[in-house]
Every structure is written in structure tokens, then in C-alpha cells.
Amino acid sequence: MLSQFFPHIKEKPLSERVKSRDAFVYLDRVMWSFGWTVPENKRWDLHYKLWSTFVTLLIFILLPISVSVEYIQRFKTFSAGEFLSSIQIGVNMYGSSFKSYLTMMGYKKRQEAKMSLDELDKRCVCDEERTIVHRHVALGNFCYIFYHIAYTSFLISNFLSFIMKRIHAWRMYFPYVDPEKQFYISSIAEVILRGWAVFMDLCTDVCPLISMVIARCHITLLKQRLRNLRSEPGRTEDEYLKELADCVRDHRLILDYVDALRSVFSGTIFVQFLLIGIVLGLSMINIMFFSTLSTGVAVVLFMSCVSMQTFPFCYLCNMIMDDCQEMADSLFQSDWTSADRRYKSTLVYFLHNLQQPIILTAGGVFPISMQTNLNMVKLAFTVVTIVKQFNLAEKFQ
């Protein structure tokens, strides 16, 4: 059903030529609409830069200021539920501005990484390998569509749950607009601006995930090639050595791909790790003490979206670390015992490099892994415990 509207989420037949960079089709289109890339036609370069500047000022700077001014000017008019709904999204929004800026600045690095993917694609000549690439490209595009549906569901449900009560969903300040007398005008302005911010946040969350999906695709292909080394009888030692050298080159390209993206994702995941515990804690307090059924559904969707910002990516990073060990095992278990000295010396050097796991870090401080993610999520329960022990919820009611 979805593939009728989004054809790139369906695995393409082998008769069509698919590149690894095609996994970013939908993501790149949305990033282009925000001014995070470059125009295809250079004649529109100035217009595109002006648009990019406008969007950056509006969403990265003016939107957080609008929320902050509303807290200062009308803090006494907030109910406890309104305040928690606003602050949990507001805190996430401040972090989103930093993440979006880092992602936008990482455009050249992402293009550099895609060039490494193009080189890796040249090695995929047999149907079996091309099928794996096609499958992962479709998976990458599906990840974007899945996240888009999830984030849109939160945006719509949160907006409707509040507007039915004639309450502002996010409480933003607009000059010369009375939020009570011009309720629907201000509400529509809120959902439009908040929608832009949500979809920017979506791009920063999906970009690392799709990138690692494609990285794991080529790691899987390399594992298969390592298992098949010296498996074809009748070839010369020089041909076997060239086959091993090609695998060394593939591994170098994978490392170059990850290294190009390392600085881009380090900052975005670091910001998200800092926020996830606080944001989830505020959301849990909102559900436990202040939410109605309609607002509770919106908060649950919000918590799901926040969890999706780190959990799948951390899980993939763990799998890639395991894949590195499996690559070393695959090489060691290949038929190398009867090889000549040149082949064995190259194999020993390559085996040493394969045993070094691919580890990404958040801000150069936290290793990006499931363990780190769980440690950060535990902060949410700490926030809830503090609120319960000091009876803060009752004081707000």
C-alpha cells in the first residue's frame, strides 16, 4: 500500500540499476526543501542561500525565542498540564536547533561519504550482492517514511487534543497577536512552525540511522567476500592475492565512509543523549499526574518519537561492532593455510586491522551503544523519583 505512494521503499528488481546513495532519496528531498544542501542549477544559488538563511533564522533562533518569551510573559496562565506539555517539547526543541545546525553544517562530509559508497558499489557485480544492496536501499528509504509517519502522528494528535479544548498546544509568543481573541490564527501559526521544527528534527534523527544501515550493508558484503577467499580452484596465487587486496581496499573505503560521518553524528547524538533522560522524565510525570486520555495519547507518541531518536541508531552501532569481530573470524576461517608467503603476510596485517572495532562516540565522550542509551534513559526514572519524593506534582495541581 505505502509503496504505491513511496516507490523507493520497495526493493527494486535487478533489471534496474540502484546505488547505495539512493537510500537517501526521501531524506535528501526534505533536506533540500529546508536549504540544507545546494541547488542543482547554480543560477538559483543566491535565492537558495537566502531561503536557507530565512529558514535558519526562523526555526533555529526565532522559534526558541518565541517559546521562551511566552514562558516569561504568561507563565502564571499555564496550567500544570499545559506547562509540562510545553516544556517537554520546548527542551527537545532547543536541542533540535543544535542538532539541525550540526546536520546542516555536515553537508560536505555527507557528500564525501557518498563518494565512498559509489566506490563500494563498483564491487557489487554479481546478482547476489546487488540484491543485498537493493534490499538495504529500500530499507533506508522505508526508515525515513516510517519516522515521517510517526512524527506526523505526534504532531497531529498533539495539536488536535489541545485545540478541541480550545487550548494552545505549544504556547508560542507572536507579536501583535492576541492568543485568546485570535485563537485559531495563532494555533495555525503554531502548528506550521512546530511542523517545520519537527521535520527538521526528523532529518537529524533519520540521517545517522540510514547511514549506518548502508554501512552495515557493505560490511555484510565484505564478510561474504572474506568467507569466499581462495574458494575458487584453478586460480593463480597472484589472482588470490589481488582478491585479498580488493577486500583490504573495501575495508578501507568502509572506514573512510564512517570517518567522514563521525564528526557529523558525534555532536547530534551527544545533544540527544543529554536531552533524552530529562525529556522522557517530564513526559512520564505529565502522563502520571496531569494528562487526560486525549493528551495522554499525544504524550505517549511523543515519548515514542524521542526514544526513536537514539535507540535504533545505538542498536545498529552495537551490531556493527559485532560485525567487525565476525569479519575477522570470516577471514581467519578462510582457506589461507596453503597460500604463499605474500598472501599470508598481507592476511596477518589485514586481520589485525579487522580486529579493531568501528566505534562511534557522542561528543568524543560517550561510546554510542545500547548500554550508553540505557544509562541515559535511566535519568528519566530519576526525575520521576524526585518529583514523587518531594510531592511536587501535588503542589502544581
Curated annotation (Swiss-Prot):
Outcome following mutation: L102F: In strain: MA45, MA50, MW37, MW6 and MW9
Tissue specificity statement from the Swiss-Prot or TrEMBL entry: Expressed with Orco in 20-22 sensory neurons on the medial-proximal edge of the antenna. This expression pattern matches the distribution of the large sensilla basiconica. Expression is first seen at 60 hours APF in a subset of cells restricted to a subregion of the developing antenna. Expression continues throughout antennal development. Expressed in the ab3A neuron which responds to ethyl butyrate.
Impact upon substituting D256N: In strain: MW44
Record localization: Cell membrane
Extracellular side: 71-85, 165-194, 290-295, 369-397
Effect of V213L: In strain: LA116, MA45, MA50, MW37, MW6, MW9, NC52a and NC73a
Keyword Cytoplasm among UniProt keywords: no
Outcome of substituting G140A: In strain: LA9
GO cellular component, one term: membrane
GO biological processes: detection of chemical stimulus involved in sensory perception of smell; sensory perception of smell; signal transduction
Result for mutant: D45I: In strain: LA116, MA45, MA50, MW37, MW6 and MW9
Result of altering V30L: In strain: NC52a and NC73a
Effect of M93V: In strain: LA116
Major localisation: membrane
Resulting phenotype, D201A: In strain: NC21a, NC52a, NC62a, NC73a and NC79b
GO molecular function, one term: olfactory receptor activity
Ranges per topology, Cytoplasmic: 1-49, 106-143, 216-268, 317-347
Impact upon substituting R235M: In strain: MA45, MA50, MW37, MW6 and MW9
Effect on the protein upon substituting Q88E: In strain: LA116
Alphabetical keyword list: Cell membrane, Membrane, Olfaction, Receptor, Sensory transduction, Transducer, Transmembrane, Transmembrane helix
Effect listed in the UniProt record for changing V69A: In strain: MA45, MA50, MW37, MW6 and MW9
PANTHER family: ODORANT RECEPTOR (PTHR21137), ODORANT RECEPTOR 19A-RELATED (PTHR21137:SF35)
Family membership: Belongs to the insect chemoreceptor superfamily. Heteromeric odorant receptor channel (TC 1.A.69) family. Or2a subfamily.
Miscellaneous comment as given in the Swiss-Prot or TrEMBL entry: The atypical heteromeric and topological design of the odorant receptors appears to be an insect-specific solution for odor recognition, making the OR/Orco complex an attractive target for the development of highly selective insect repellents to disrupt olfactory-mediated host-seeking behaviors of insect disease vectors. Odor-evoked OR currents are independent of known G-protein-coupled second messenger pathways.
Subunit structure, interactors included: Interacts with Orco, via conserved C-terminal cytoplasmic loops. Complexes exist early in the endomembrane system in olfactory sensory neurons (OSNs), coupling these complexes to the conserved ciliary trafficking pathway.
Protein name: Odorant receptor 22b
Organism field: Drosophila melanogaster
Gene: Or22b
